[in-house]
Swiss-Prot record:
Catalytic activity: 6 Fe(III)-[cytochrome c] + NH4(+) + 2 H2O = 6 Fe(II)-[cytochrome c] + nitrite + 8 H(+)
Location in the cell: Periplasm
Protein name: Cytochrome c-552
Binding site for substrate: 216, 264
Any GO BP: anaerobic electron transport chain
Designated gene of the protein: nrfA
Cofactor: how bound: Binds 1 Ca(2+) ion per monomer. Binds 5 heme c groups covalently per monomer.
Family: Belongs to the cytochrome c-552 family.
Function: Catalyzes the reduction of nitrite to ammonia, consuming six electrons in the process.
Pathway noted in the entry: Nitrogen metabolism; nitrate reduction (assimilation)
Native species: Pectobacterium atrosepticum (strain SCRI 1043 / ATCC BAA-672) (Erwinia carotovora subsp. atroseptica)
First-listed, main subcellular location of the protein, grouped into a coarse class: periplasm
Positions annotated to bind heme c 4: 282, 285-286, 393
Length: 477
């Protein structure tokens, strides 16, 4: 028994020694490799993808600015109290993404990194530097602070790394390597049942564009970007979402209505149109395959009007000639434009009549249902017109939204007539002269001379400092 006991003790000692001598494999397991740093300088990729790069650079030819407020002064009134009443140009080439966000009056004239009216989130659709900063700082870190904080960091125009995994072997081999470079966009796609990784090639093509060409808002204390898609992507779905969280972008200074400002909801409106339902993607129409000088096909990155490349876009599906198709589009555009102006006219009257009701002594309780009608009416109008191509993407949906906008405005104005009568106001509420952008801005109390002077000083003094800091840090070529 003693010998057996000693043998067992000896064996246990040997086992213990072996355990002590074994290497600590768990400590030596290599950590998951960190992702390669995002390269935001677009010109780095010119040798890998020369045709794509040069066609992307050609978006600088789309240089003309169109002043939407000068064309339609009603919008100044609809956005009274919001930066869009100062300045709103129609979109132009991607090559101007940084220039335009710096130069618009909407971003103000900050003097320091902590100054200015807008948050960091206002850079989010402008540059691959955004993806770089999110990778470096995390989303929480990126969204902290004012827009001016990003000035020296976000300097490269919307480009390669916004849509492509430029560090991947696939990209180096000439493949698209599409990616969602904005994590909040990836979460939004998952919320509507469209996870990017399991989407088809066609689905991914539109999702990549849908990182920016969407409705979004700034959420929480850090004003982080979020898409309001929890209930769906139709105008009523997003309205329900916003109402449930009592969100408003601003308060109209005339009517005091809590307003929503639609951004550029092309993904949502395209999805419900004939092209979206048939999975004809943004790329099919706006970035067709074309041939280079050697006859090799490549994707044209000069994003533009499909009619500019009619033979490579529309004729893949349509048999009509170009003139016939242009006539169809023009007819739809005219129908949208006519209803748009009718909706705006009713909304403008509603805002001024609401102001008259407040001035006559109306109470919060009197006004609450009226202001909700105005909010809902303008939201429908704005979602329709902020999607610049809705006459092509989803004309029926555009007309439907504008029609419901008119209905909501009519409800608001009917209630206002009754309320004004109760307050002793029985005559028509006269509008001031708002026949031009300048007169409309004056009517809502904007000092445009001061606003423009402050902006020019910012462009002359602050912006050059941003660029110099970026060059010294190697963020610009």
């Amino acid at each position: 028994m003693v010998r057996i006991s000693m043998s067992i003790s000896y064996l246990w000692g040997m086992v213990a020694s072996l355990f002590l001598m074994m290497p600590a494999y768990s400590a030596d397991v290599p950590a998951s490799p960190s992702p390669a740093p995002i390269e935001a300088r677009n010109s780095v990729f010119i040798n890998q993808h020369p045709d794509q790069f040069n066609s992307w650079k050609a978006t600088s030819e789309q240089s003309e600015r169109h002043d939407a407020l000068a064309e339609d002064p009603y919008m100044v009134i609809l956005w009274a109290g919001y930066p869009f009443s100062r300045d709103y140009n129609k979109p132009r080439g991607h090559a101007y993404a940084i220039t335009d966000v710096r130069e618009t009056l909407r971003t103000g004239a900050p003097k320091t990194a902590e100054d200015g009216p807008l948050p960091m989130a206002c850079w989010s659709c402008k540059s691959p530097d955004v993806a770089r900063l999110i990778q470096q700082e995390g989303e929480e870190g990126y969204f902290k602070g004012k827009w001016a904080r990003g000035g020296p960091e976000i300097t490269n125009d919307l480009g390669c790394a916004d849509c492509h995994d430029t560090a991947s072997p696939d990209f180096a081999q000439g493949k698209p390597a599409l990616t969602l470079s904005r994590p909040y966009a990836e979460r939004a796609m998952e919320a509507i049942g469209k996870p990017f990784d399991s989407a088809s090639r066609f689905g991914q093509q539109s999702m990549v564009c849908g990182q920016c060409h969407v409705e979004y808002y700034f959420s929480g204390k850090d004003k982080a970007v979020k898409f309001p898609w929890d209930n769906g992507t139709k105008v009523e779905d997003m309205e329900k979402y916003y109402d449930a969280i009592s969100f408003s972008d601003w308060t109209n200074t005339l009517s005091r209505a809590p307003m929503l400002k639609a951004q550029h909801p092309e993904y949502e409106t395209w999805s419900v149109g004939i092209h979206g339902k048939n999975n004809v993607t943004c790329i099919d129409c706006h970035m067709p395959k074309v041939k280079n000088a050697d006859g090799k096909l490549y994707t044209d990155h000069k994003i533009g009007n499909p009619f500019d490349n009619y033979g490579e876009t529309c004729t893949n599906c349509h048999t009509q000639d170009k003139a016939a198709m242009q006539a169809v589009v023009a007819e739809r555009k005219t129908a949208i434009q006519e209803l748009k102006l009718k909706a705006e006219e009713q909304l403008v009257h509603a805002h001024f009549e609401a102001k008259a009701a407040w001035d006559a002594g109306a109470t919060e309780a009197d006004m609450q249902p009226i202001l909700i009608d105005i909010r809902h009416a303008q939201w429908r109008w704005d979602l329709a017109v902020a999607s610049h191509g809705i006459h092509m993407h989803a004309p029926d949906e555009g007309l439907r939204m504008l029609g419901t906008s008119l209905s909501k405005s009519a409800e608001a104005r009917t209630k206002l007539v009754r309320l004004l009568a109760q307050k002793g106001v029985t005559g028509e509420v006269k509008l001031p002269d708002i026949s031009t952008k300048e007169k409309a801005q004056q009517a809502i109390g904007l000092n445009m001379q001061q606003i423009n002077a402050e902006k020019q000083d910012f462009l002359n003094t602050v912006v050059p400092q941003w660029d110099e800091q970026a060059r010294k840090a190697g963020r610009l070529n």
